[in-house]
Amino acid sequence: MPRTFRNPILPGFYPDPSICRVGDDYYLVNSTFEYFPGLPIFHSRDLVHWRQLGHILDRPSQLPLDGVYASGGLYAPTIRYNRGTFYVINTLVGGTSKSGNFIVTATDPAGPWSEPYWLENAPGIDPSLFFDDDGRAWYVGNRMATDSRYDGHTEIWLQELDLAAMCLVGEPCVLWEGAARDAVWAEAPHLYKINGQYYLMIAEGGTSHDHAVTIARSGEITGPYKANRRNPIITHRHLGQDYQIVGTGHADLVETQFGEWWMVLLAMRPYGGYFYNLGRETFLVPLRWEEGWPVVAPGSGRVALAERTPDLPEQRWPAVPACDHFETQTLAPHWNFLRTPRDDFWSLCARPGYLRLRLRPERLTDLANPSFVGRRQQHMRFSARAALEFRPQHDDECAGLVLVQNNEFHIRFVITGGATPTVHLVKRSTPESNPQLMPIIPGTDVTLAELPIEGSRFYFKVEADGQAYSFYIATEPESWHPVAEGVDGRILSTPYAGGFVGTYIGMYASSNGQPSTNSADFDWFEYLGLDEN
């Protein structure tokens, strides 16, 4: 029997994958939107097992996310390698300072990466780079069509890039508007040169249920491009909302050192109805070339949960520990913040063995950088626990755990203060789902549970069984008291809340608009995935 692996290769909120190979090593990056650090970079030797090297943008000077709205920030990146240098090109959307398309470079994929080279006169999103064998470099991206006739009418455009000056030169040209008649949201372009032909692969249909991957080719880089008559080369839009994998699209291709071809792409796994709290995830699917065109998932034409393993030597990496005791000098790379931190709101040194969060006025509902340290929900079933030492000094102060979809859709499970500490479980959402991905609709707070509690050391537990989330509190280890069980988690899914991101769970502290000198100390945080493979 051939070996198989389990999709997705990166579970949880890891959308818009881009991949490149250097020798026997593979590198992959994903979009991160309003989260900091930005753009995780992963390394693999077998395309199945991945380890995170760090982030492309890990310094505040590189990434001004100040004021970025929910699902703004860093959109789809592309990673490429050329003559000893790695390049990542990306788009920063929204915010109150810099925005637009930019390039960063490194000679080591683990970093450090350069400060951004911002590109002028480069409208649109989803930029990609192509290095031709004649030494010329090209920028390819998407933008609203110059003769826009309908909503979602975009075009793929090309312009030469001067690598020495990091600027676009020459005249831009339009390559394609997509395969479908009146195609919508032609985006995510990538160029490849194979056997003397230029291939332009894009996504269209929008990054939801109608998502698809299409391809065209030309003998000249500037076109004209002829579409594959068998487009789309991969989509699940015809399989219904109850299919186990939906929204397939936004792909990139890689050839192994042994001549096999593989595609990475995003997709979603709905559960509890057409809801996907884990967000858009990274999947891997084989392809082969027939009559000059790629055939994706030969024999089925579908992205599968179980797929044959690439013909590469297996290379596993040490597993990420389930429990973080905060005994190192830096946070593990799976931890993230909301937007760019402009002051030191967290510390691993103030109290060794603890993660200290300063209480600040910023709240989850603000388009700011609250005192939040979180990680992705990566499983439909999971258990998360944490130990917190905290003495609230005023009624406005709180600390605990939160489940975050965005600033208007989240669940706060916190200790609040004054003379008598209280456990508060608060859901922020809207009564009905958001009918569109953007913009995010303002929500309101609803208190789900409230009970007094004594002490200054608290144990939190959150369990998810599909869309049912349960919350427990204790003042002694394992002496759990139910706060609320079976809470509806669908508000944490983009089909309900809107936007482009997946659910985070993490640690949070706030003085809710008031000044404070207080802090909250987290002794440890544990996350256990309970999905059956």
Whereabouts are the PLM-identified features?
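Carbohydrate-active catalytic/glycan-binding domains of CAZyme proteins
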Residues: 1-533
